[in-house]
């Protein structure tokens, strides 16, 4: 565990602010307190032995305790100032342990070559897999696959061909996603690596090309949410039920763009297998999170020991030659657990949620939305006919999942004279293993054969129906139940179909019965009333038993909050002191020290990338900048083009830029010659694409709310010229807003834009930054 002491200068400031904060608190209570009185009170605290011990502990405590997420990012951040400890909100340059690309490897390669790169910075950092369109045998797709394989061979990259398995599963079973490391992938379900204690998070193609060429890209550390599990899962309830319930019960964007850390008592976490954790972590993507991290604990250690033993016996590879045996070794395992990374006591979380697993029952997601989750029992009563069932995807198609599905048919065989029953008439049941090793394991147990005997249709190991590709897609009017991770309208076929998500046993039972149903393994506990969940850690204050150390940590945490409040007051009331003591942000040469403009307000939340740049232009590569400027925001407001002017600052509501990953959503705004976008919050991919393409952005909820207070009454105006102006002082990390001629003027602190990100924007975006870095 990393540790650090407060520097003398940092401690001095901490005490100064704490004195100031305590003084103001005391003044608010007495209305007559003076600084001299405060000093006397403070001195009296030091004379009390208990208080003296507290302040002594505060003296030697860590300056800012880190979450597990922050600790891992700390390890893989480069170019940090000496003594810098990263925290949520920081922009950092990261050098990830691994970077995986799949079928999009060829577009990444084209981008890589277009920037003048000729060799990979570190071939061992890169993994390439073919998994998405593996059923497509067209000449065009096979040519692309050959090009990817040739590129990988030329550059010495570990490559996994079509049919070997899904990239995320390969990252896990081949040891690329190693506990305590940072791994990225150009795919949204890289969150899955968190199931083995590896911080996995998605990147876009330009980022991947940057990692290939330089070994690095950038990342803004998200706010971190702690999710505490209590109790243990009842028989018949699975990890899929856990994450489906979380998506449906906390469905107000509770963890949108957060990094999640799952925790719980030793008993609770011991009850969650690695396969269960992988399922939960995988679907944190659908919950809106950027990562889903489980602890590095005894459960994981046992799983890794099994992998290391298998590798040492030469059994890890099967018919496939890999280097897994070099990654799964007992010496590496012992080294990992000598001092495993954990969150510091007192680490700050943006929010805390809890779920009592013992109160959970089987859940089903949908139709056509992960935000709709219903207890299976309620849906069974509706006799919903099922046309297609799917045991596929990286979420739930490992050997343990296949075994659970096979068990449904094996139990039914006991009532059928020992003969495996067939799936219901009119139902098609598709199965595809997450990888060939998982399929081989299922075959070794006889489970794969059981499903085939029941009438299942085998698909190649890889993606397929779950991403709307290949055989078995839903037709108009059909109903499907799938063990995959995403069920929005049209995802698995027709937009006129209904898609539900459930556990492997629910999928199997539904295929067998012909209607949405379960195997009957779950029995409602006596006295059950509801799923127990909420904010916090779920421990009632009257039940909270704290050790002296924990009580001290709690008090220190409360004092740290008081310090933070005092710093805010200190900053607002004594700006000169703030600047001299905290310093100013360094400005990268060529980056503007100030950005100013008139505010044009698009008053809407969830403006998606299709609203910003119409989809019909997305795959036209020859659209000139003038046309991009003209169609910018066209699907949101056709009048935007004539209302917004060059040099304006665009302000919109919350979750601006959600939706697809099209880079043109950023470049179209730049084509309109708007240099800065301000919103209540941004979609994560839009944020990445903005910086990668040199568009500046600020999150200022206060400004959005103030604009709505001022202009909210009367007729709705989609795009409004406000007459307000904003000046962003980059050095001070502060904006100044002038509410029209003669109106109020106010300032507000904003997040720091550090020099490493300024450099990317000043160079004209990430591609040009990479060109400069490699001397192309």
Swiss-Prot record:
Arranged from A to Z, the UniProt key words for this protein are: Amino-acid biosynthesis, Iron, Iron-sulfur, Lyase, Lysine biosynthesis, Metal-binding, Mitochondrion, Transit peptide
Catalytic reaction list:
(2R,3S)-homoisocitrate = cis-homoaconitate + H2O
Q: Give the transit peptide range.
A: 1-38
Is the Repeat keyword given for this protein?
Answer: no
Q: Does the keyword Metal-binding apply?
A: yes
* Classification via Pfam families: Aconitase, Aconitase_C
Please share the entry's free-text remark on the cofactor: Binds 1 [4Fe-4S] cluster per subunit.
Write down the top EC class of this protein: lyase
Q: Which domain of life is it from?
A: Eukaryota
Instruction: Specify the pathway.
Output: Amino-acid biosynthesis; L-lysine biosynthesis via AAA pathway; L-alpha-aminoadipate from 2-oxoglutarate: step 3/5
Q: Which residues bind [4Fe-4S] cluster?
A: 394, 463, 466
Q: Where in the cell is it found?
A: Mitochondrion
InterPro entries, per the entry: Acnase/IPM_dHydase_lsu_aba_1/3 (IPR015931), Acoase/IPM_deHydtase_lsu_aba (IPR001030), Aconitase/3IPM_dehydase_swvl (IPR015928), Aconitase_4Fe-4S_BS (IPR018136), Aconitase_4Fe-4S_dom (IPR036008), AconitaseA/IPMdHydase_ssu_swvl (IPR000573), Homoaconitase_mito (IPR004418), Homoaconitase_swivel (IPR039386)
For this protein, what is the EC number? 4.2.1.36
- A molecular function (GO) term: 4 iron, 4 sulfur cluster binding
What does the entry report about how pH modulates activity?
Optimum pH is 8.1-8.6.
A GO CC annotation recorded here is: mitochondrial matrix
State the family it belongs to.
Belongs to the aconitase/IPM isomerase family.
Query: What is this protein's record name?
Result: Homoaconitase, mitochondrial
Q: Which organism is it from?
A: Emericella nidulans (strain FGSC A4 / ATCC 38163 / CBS 112.46 / NRRL 194 / M139)
